[in-house]
Amino acid sequence: CLLLNTISSCSMMAQSIGSAISGSTYPSDDLELVAVEADYAAKEAALQAEIDNIEISHPGYDEYRYDLDMIGHDPHELAAYLSAVLQGYTRQSAQAELERVFDAQYQLTLTEEVEVRYRTETRTDSEGNSYTVEVPYNYYILNVKLTSKPISSVASELLTPEQLEMYQVYRQTLGNKPLIFGGGSTNTSDSESLEGVE
């Protein structure tokens, strides 16, 4: 009887652990996760290209002033956000939410400014004497400002309390797929090997 109770308890504990692991794993297929990440990175690349080409797309200014935040994101923050909102998602089903996140993360503002400046010109009077005058002219400036915030800030603004809780679980576990977006290592233990060190 004791053996049956022990087996039953172990079985329930295994089910509980299995539920906890599956509840903290990204519910989407790996290929979809990677494809959606690539789509978001492409949006960021397009934004960078737009900024890089401002002087071509908006010609005619005397000066361009840039105040730019960084462009970039943590792929696991994006996957955690989308998983919390959409649960299992595909490349197609995630597009509207990708746009929503992108619009909340990045704000590009172009503002025209006109300064009246003065230049010194030399003129000659009717008697042949030279004199200088300050002549006003318009100096055109295009202010280019990009503000950005991390997806973690976007998440706290846009998610419901329940979604935010799921987002935080996915962030802590990296969806149980820490290497899906490349880089890093699953080994978090201290390294003691001095192999190759002379």
Where is each model-derived feature located?
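Membrane-proximal envelope biogenesis segments
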Residues: 1-197
